């Protein structure tokens, strides 16, 4: 399926411009794009709610914001098309036609693989079937392994694919795992972009930087996975897009205000009301990049009078376990 510059390309480049793509980057990108007819993108959906896809679509429709950052100029530079080979939600084809694409594209090489949703591994992966191959069910786990072989980059879009997230919360009966827990042999290809959902500018900006041939510096810290167990993992978050803990003097706009003790108050710090922004692993740039579109004022969670729920945190949604059994799960941390 082809998505022209008024679709995928415009969204992706808008993100790059908004995140600081300079003239040198644009000139380099022009050379890269002119040397190729398309950039293949495979978007695989596993156990999730399609929220990251919806986040992506919101950016595509954001015409006003594009003009605000003059991204239509960059759009003219990065012209032609990006070839979104497979996306089960957005494809015009369905059923067997969809599967023909899926079962042929993984044999090619050089594509960017975007993975949305956690990967169920229980019952040999049969809790999540993405289609059929040779008349047999094709699990998301097997599809992920197949596409990982020839992928140039593997982007875990959203907290479910990056850290298990909501899909792997609680007792995790379907034994959901994160992408990097399954693809251990392709560790250097993987880029985690957590968020529930992933921020569209972060996803788009990451793709732009990869196309420009830039090396993304990653965090080398470790953090607990969702479910509250003792498993430790490299978070693989690019520092450019995940620069600091949200609860900081330069990142949180509410930190300077009084501590609120009631919900529904404006311009108050919600640290005592359960805000997860102060957690050492709530590292994200969502407030500086902002959420939403112009008609909803692009305020994001904090600007809308809410608190941070820590959706980019590897422990999200913060399940508490007693003797290995999930006893509660709360996105808030009341003091």
Residues of each region from the PLM?
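N-terminal secretory signal peptides
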Residues: 1-3, 31
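N-terminal export signals
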Residues: 7-29
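C-terminal segment of N-terminal export signals and the immediately downstream linker at the start
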Residues: 22-45
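Short N-terminal binding/cap micro-motifs at the start of the first secondary-structure element
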Residues: 49-55
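Short catalytic helix/loop segments, enriched in acidic residues and glycine
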Residues: 59-78
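Glycine/threonine-rich flexible loop motifs
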Residues: 122-137, 165-171
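Catalytic-core regions built around general acid/base machinery
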Residues: 138-151
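C-terminal and late-domain segments of enzyme folds
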Residues: 205-209, 213-335
């Amino acid at each position: 399926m082809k998505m022209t510059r008024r679709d995928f390309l415009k969204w992706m480049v808008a993100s790059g411009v908004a995140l600081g793509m300079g003239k040198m980057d644009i000139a380099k990108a022009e050379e890269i794009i002119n040397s190729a007819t398309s950039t293949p993108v495979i978007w695989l959906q596993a156990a999730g709610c399609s929220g990251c896809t919806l986040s992506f679509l919101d950016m595509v429709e954001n015409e006003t914001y594009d003009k605000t950052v003059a991204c239509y100029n960059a759009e003219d530079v990065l012209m032609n098309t990006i070839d979104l080979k497979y996306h089960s939600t957005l494809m015009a084809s369905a059923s067997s036609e969809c599967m023909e694409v899926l079962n042929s594209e993984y044999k090619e090489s050089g594509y960017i693989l975007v993975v949305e949703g956690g990967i169920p591994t229980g019952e040999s992966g049969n809790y999540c079937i993405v289609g059929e191959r040779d008349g047999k069910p094709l699990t998301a786990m097997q599809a992920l392994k197949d596409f990982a072989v020839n992928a140039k980059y593997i982007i875990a879009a959203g907290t479910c694919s990056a850290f298990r997230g909501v899909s792997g919360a609680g007792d995790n009966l379907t034994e959901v795992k994160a992408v990097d827990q399954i693809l251990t042999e392709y560790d250097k290809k993987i880029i985690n972009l957590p968020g529930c959902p992933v921020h569209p500018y972060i996803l788009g900006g990451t793709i732009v930087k990869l196309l420009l041939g830039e090396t993304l510096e990653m965090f080398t810290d470790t953090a607990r996975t969702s479910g509250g167990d003792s498993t430790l993992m490299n978070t693989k978050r690019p520092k450019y897009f995940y620069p600091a803990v949200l609860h900081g003097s330069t990142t949180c706009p509410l930190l300077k205000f009084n501590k609120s003790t009631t919900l529904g108050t404006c311009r108050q710090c919600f640290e005592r009301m359960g805000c997860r922004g102060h957690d050492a692993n709530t590292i994200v740039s969502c407030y500086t990049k902002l959420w939403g579109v112009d008609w909803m004022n692009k305020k994001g969670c904090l600007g809308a009078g809410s608190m941070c729920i820590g959706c980019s945190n590897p422990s999200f949604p913060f399940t508490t376990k007693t003797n290995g059994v999930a006893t509660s799960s709360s996105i808030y941390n009341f003091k």
